[in-house]
Regions:
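Peripheral terminal and inter-domain segments
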Residues: 312-313, 321, 343, 385-530
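Short, well-ordered beta-strand elements
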Residues: 347-348, 358-361, 365-374, 506-507
Length: 530
């Protein structure tokens, strides 16, 4: 097919929209299907062909059987290295369940309580609303009901910046809520970073040290590292994306470079192989117990982590086009919990620039599946659903055709949304001489940008984010656009407010309406530094 891919926002929506549902009348579970290597191959390879996927890793966990583990394709286009069962992928937001488990272990040790106020352990913690500061609990850090808007603060750490985890605490008082506290669901990463700071404060170990010594080592996750900074060797999955034209998500598949930094780790930092993640799924379904009987956490804590806390979405349930659409989707502690054909599914997705990973468990069947892809499209979600259906004997459904159809519809919608393209400047011109826009501007949660004027041209540098450096082009009245290097991230539109012949304010938004939510330029509010 011609290239089109979804971003992390869309991958998450596709995952929630197609991964789980209440069974409709007449559907019945067959006995767990015998799915051998040839059967898995027959499910995976058509997806790879349809989506032009360079590489896939698969793990399947079943009762009384060793895990099925296999790699497909190549680590990086243009290079010889093959994906195998020890190839490391960035598991991104699948890391959130590790942060939740770390907190559960500290709860077991009575060092914290789930319903302790965060300020009990982090006295410097502040939210925009002082009342919310006092009410926010350890549990609230994990369940996406803080009132913060989607992706708030993500520009602190994505792409790589000079910010450190403590800067999340400094930023939070300036991030305005989009809704009331505990009034609804909006996905965030920043509060998981705060959770990582809390783990360090209480345990005396950095989040990375805690994950490595308390989880990865006991589990024998020998390929895994808690942060990309610790990756070594060549057996690492590459990153691939379609960078346009006209927008990211379309055009030929290209190799891109990782752009996440260590500040992101407690929300999305772990790198692991499918061999590793099979062990994680096994200990999850065993209620925290290792094969030797040792408990990393109790069954009570296992149940606590899977208990729904926040309603994510609801619908009328399955349709012929989407037979696993959830009736209700919820978020627990580091996991989505929802229905899949009438039974509970515990799952998560994770997206980085150039990679998407999926994990899912059907605990009542003892079945777990992980699918890792080295592209940023939705192929891993379709493969996951196909594997789950095959493993549970669900009614036949053509997930390849469905995924291709959904992708084409998304492409059509995208093209309609950017009709005329994103490279057509709106009418209007700057009202001031270009030198008047030059200077240093500061945002209270992100930091500074510097705009320079040289020989009649403007340029911008985001001070904490080195890769965000670009010439500026006029883009309507008192507005300009960036052209960041290919693969560096989404471009932004800058709008200057002018009063009495001087700039008084600078705001931004992503150029493309389809930009991933982590490019939260719209949350920035700069003022000139005098």
């Amino acid at each position: 097919m011609s290239g089109f891919q979804v971003n992390r926002r869309q991958a998450l929506a596709l995952s929630l929209g197609s991964a789980a549902a209440l069974a409709v009348p007449g559907w019945a579970w067959a006995a767990a299907a015998e799915l051998d290597e040839a059967g898995v191959d027959a499910l995976v390879r058509p997806f790879m062909a349809a989506f032009e996927t360079p590489g896939i890793g698969v793990a399947i966990v079943r009762p009384n059987l060793p895990p099925f583990l296999k790699g497909y394709g190549v680590c990086t286009l243009g290079k010889a290295g093959a994906i195998d069962t020890h190839t490391r992928f960035g598991i991104a937001s699948n890391s959130k369940s590790f942060t939740a488990a770390s907190l559960a272990m500290l709860v077991e040790e009575k060092k914290i309580g789930w319903d302790d106020p965060v300020v009990k352990h982090l006295p410097e913690f502040r939210m925009y609303d002082p009342a919310v500061t006092q009410m926010m609990t350890v549990r609230d850090l994990l369940v996406h009901r803080s009132g913060l808007p989607l992706g708030a603060g993500d520009l602190l750490y994505f792409p790589t910046s000079t910010h450190v985890p403590a800067d999340a605490l400094k930023a939070l008082p300036y991030l305005k809520p989009a809704r009331g506290f505990r009034a609804g669901y909006d996905y965030d990463n920043i509060l998981y970073i705060v959770a990582g700071v809390l783990i360090e404060r209480v345990s005396g170990m950095s989040w990375q040290q805690f994950i490595a010594t308390r989880l990865l080592a006991p589990l024998g996750m020998t390929d895994a590292v808690p942060t990309r900074a610790q990756l070594s060797g060549d057996n690492v999955a590459g990153r691939h994306a379609r960078l346009g034209p006209p927008i990211r998500g379309m055009g030929p598949m290209k190799v891109i470079q990782p752009d996440e930094g260590p500040m992101f780790d407690a929300a999305a930092g772990i790198n692991a192989s499918v061999t590793d993640i099979a062990k994680w799924l096994q200990v999850q379904m065993a209620g925290g117990r290792l094969p030797d009987g040792k408990a990393l956490w109790s069954r009570d804590q296992a149940q606590e982590m899977w208990k729904p806390e926040t309603i994510v979405a609801s619908s009328d349930g399955p349709t012929p086009e989407n037979p696993t659409r959830p009736v209700t989707s919820t978020y627990a502690l580091g996991w989505f919990v929802q229905d899949y054909r009438g039974v509970r599914m515990v799952s998560h997705s994770g997206g980085l620039s150039g990679q998407v990973t999926q994990t899912a468990m059907i605990p009542s069947r003892g079945i777990g599946v992980a699918v890792f892809s080295n592209t940023e499209d939705g192929v891993s979600g379709g493969i996951r659903n196909a594997l789950l259906d095959a493993l549970t004997g669900a009614p036949a459904f053509d997930w390849v055709a469905s995924s291709v159809s959904r992708t084409r519809k998304a492409q059509e919608s995208a093209l309609a949304e950017v009709s005329g393209g994103v490279d057509t400047a709106p009418p209007g011109t700057p009202s001031l001489p270009l030198k008047a826009y030059a200077g240093r501007y500061s945002d209270p949660w992100y930091g500074d940008v510097v705009i320079t004027e040289t020989r009649g041209k403007l340029a911008i540098q985001f001070v904490p984010t080195a890769v965000f450096k670009s010439a500026l082009e006029p883009w309507g009245p008192d507005a300009f656009r960036t052209r960041f290097p290919a693969g560096a991230g989404e471009d932004a539109v800058l709008t200057f407010e002018v009063k009495d012949g001087a700039v008084t304010r600078l705001t931004m938004k992503a150029l493309s309406p389809l930009a991933d939510f982590s490019y939260d330029f719209h949350h920035l509010d700069f003022t000139p530094v005098r």
